[in-house]
Every structure is written in C-alpha cells, then in structure tokens.
Amino acid sequence: MAMKAVCVLKGDGPVQGTINFEQKESNGPVKVWGSITGLAEGLHGFHVHQFGDNTQGCTSAGPHFNPLSRKHGGPEDEERHVGDLGNVTAGKDGVAKVSIEDSVISLSGDHSIIGRTLVVHEKADDLGKGGNEESTKTGNAGSRLACGVIGIAQ
C-alpha cells in the first residue's frame, strides 16, 4: 500500500516551501517533489535531520539522520547518511523545483523519515568530497535556512 508524507518548510527569512513524499511499496523508492521559494540562486544542501524537534528553530533538529553511522555523502554514494538527499537548485527567481527519487530513505521501518526534520541549507552540499572533517559530517552546506517536520499525509 502506498504511503504519503508532506513537509512544510519555514525559516526565519523568506525561504519557504512544501515537499511531498510517496512510497508505493514498503521497500521501494521514495518519490520526493515540491518547490522551495526565497532562495539565493544556485545549489542548496537538502537533508533529513535526526529529530522532529523545531523548538529552537532548525538547530534543534540535530545532525543528519544517520542510523547506520556512516560518513556524509551524495545521494548516489554507497557511503552516505540515510538523510543525505544532495542539493536542490534554485533559479534566478529564487525557486527550487524538487524532483528526486531515493531508494535509501523510507516512509516506514528502520529508515523511516516520518517525524524527522527536512532542512534546506544556505550553501551547496559538497557531497562529502570537500577534503575536510566537516565535509564528512555536513557537506559544508552552511546554515539552516528553513525546515519542517515530515508528517504522514492522506
């Protein structure tokens, strides 16, 4: 049975958006789509973080969701956090149209992202290839512009 989820992204500044998730079968890939507005033109890191806690803004969401204790990487890499979804690209109009299919995240089971926080970052994610320690943790993606808790949808 298909599962669906949704996340409304908000931050302290102009960045906001709505991201949808759908998984047709429990061990199948998750489709991720939607749009984010108010971004600077270019690439922005896009990750699922550990906690669904936004009590202190996006900071209380903790680190990237990483139940397998791996190093940070890109969405196509074998060595990656479960929450590593790479980058979204904003055009000159500040809008990023998101369309991703990922086989590591899930809407159920051990890798479920339900109840966790989705974050869009200030800078591009270097996908763990930045050559320093921070790269292997965060991809040097910078501050958290907007976030929201991923919830079950109809």
Swiss-Prot record:
Zn(2+) binds at H64, H72, H81, D84. It comes from the Eukaryota. SUPFAM superfamilies: Cu,Zn superoxide dismutase-like. It catalyses: 2 superoxide + 2 H(+) = H2O2 + O2. Binds 1 copper ion per subunit. Binds 1 zinc ion per subunit. Its cofactor is Cu cation; Zn(2+). It is found in: Cytoplasm; Nucleus. The modification Phosphoserine is found at S99, S103, S106, S108. Keywords: Acetylation, Antioxidant, Copper, Cytoplasm, Disulfide bond, Lipoprotein, Metal-binding, Nucleus, Oxidoreductase, Palmitate, Phosphoprotein, Zinc. Disulfide bonds join C58-C147. The modification N6-acetyllysine is found at K123, K137. Transmembrane segments: none annotated. Its EC number is 1.15.1.1. A lipid is attached at C7 (S-palmitoyl cysteine). Palmitoylation helps nuclear targeting and decreases catalytic activity. Succinylation, adjacent to copper catalytic site, probably inhibits activity. Desuccinylation by SIRT5 enhances activity. Residues 59-81 are annotated as: Disordered. The keyword 4Fe-4S does not apply. CDD domains: Cu-Zn_Superoxide_Dismutase. InterPro entries: SOD-like_Cu/Zn_dom_sf, SOD_Cu/Zn_/chaperone, SOD_Cu/Zn_BS, SOD_Cu_Zn_dom. The modification N-acetylalanine is found at A2. Homodimer; non-disulfide-linked. Heterodimer with SOD1. The heterodimer CCS:SOD1 interacts with SLC31A1; this heterotrimer is Cu(1+)-mediated and its maintenance is regulated through SOD1 activation. Destroys radicals which are normally produced within the cells and which are toxic to biological systems. This is Superoxide dismutase [Cu-Zn]. The lineage of its organism: Eukaryota, Metazoa, Chordata, Craniata, Vertebrata. The gene is SOD1.
